[in-house]
Amino acid sequence: MTDLLTLGETMVSVRTERPMRLGGDAQLSIAGSESNVAIGVARLGHDVTWLSAVGNDEPGRLIQRTLRAENVDARVRFADDAFTGFIAFDQPSHDITRVSYHRRGSAASTLTPDETTAAITELSPTLIHVTGITPALSDTARAATLAAVRTTNAQVSLDVNYRARLWSRADAAATLRELLPHIHTVFASDDELDLISDAEDPIADLLQTVHTVVVTAGGKGAWSHTRTPEPLAIHRPALPVTVVDSVGAGDAFVSGYLSATLDNLSPEARLDRASTSGAFCVTAYGDWESLPTRDDLTLLTHAQGTALR
């Protein structure tokens, strides 16, 4: 049994705080949307499993070790004939982060439907979380994602997470809409809704298929729309924090929402925890390093600059 199962690619990451071509110090870590969510949910006290493949190499072992250290059950296949993906972050200016991928043909792109369905059968997860990144990696990874959502009785969430460098908007829309009939909760930024609905009112359209649509809009906050006899719409503003690095904020938001879902909290409380987790993430560099524990969740109620003694 596991509370949450997620699947997808995690890469070794290198980050510099200036243009990378200038050299100098760099930080080595790991990065991947699904593992970011896994770490966030695990830090909030839940049992979490992450399924993927990595190369039989040192970057792959770094990923496994890091996730295990974060109390995530890392179900990893080490591939001898494929490599661990790589991602680089650099900053051409203080408030702009540039991302470079090296992931085509990576080990994670070889994830198979048999692997995902076997994990679901073994683990009987309460929730399954998928993103639009995994099916963009390869036809095999797309089939693995579809198999996961089609063969489970668990509640499934989907984060659209469109990546233009991985596939076109047309290809993304076709695959994401194939997933939708099996999805309970959809997460999307306000500029991604057209990928999953052509309707003039995409929220109303989506709520004919899914139970909940959560829309994020950066500094404007987030909205949750739930299918009820009288459709329930909730808004939460972005919390007032000093933004250092926004990379990973969406994954942090999702992790807070899924944790609150596992705790059977109200739609309002789910959005509150999601907003809090997202706010924590942007206060430091890194995709996941500043994600909160359960004890941390109340810290942002203190005034900025407070010293807790």
Where are these regions (language model features)?
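Conserved phosphate-binding/catalytic region of the ribokinase-like
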Residues: 1-5, 199-309
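Ribokinase/PfkB-type carbohydrate-kinase core domain
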Residues: 1-6, 68, 93-232, 296, ...
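Glycine-rich phosphate/adenosyl-contacting loop at the front of the ribokinase-like
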Residues: 1-72, 308-309
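Short beta-strand scaffold segments in enzyme catalytic cores
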Residues: 39, 86-90, 221-225
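Short phosphate-binding/catalytic loops that engage adenosine nucleotides
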Residues: 46, 72, 154, 211, ...
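Beta-strand->loop->alpha-helix junctions that form or flank phosphate-binding loops
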Residues: 53-55, 74-82, 214-216
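A glycine-rich helix N-cap at a beta->alpha junction
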Residues: 64-85, 92
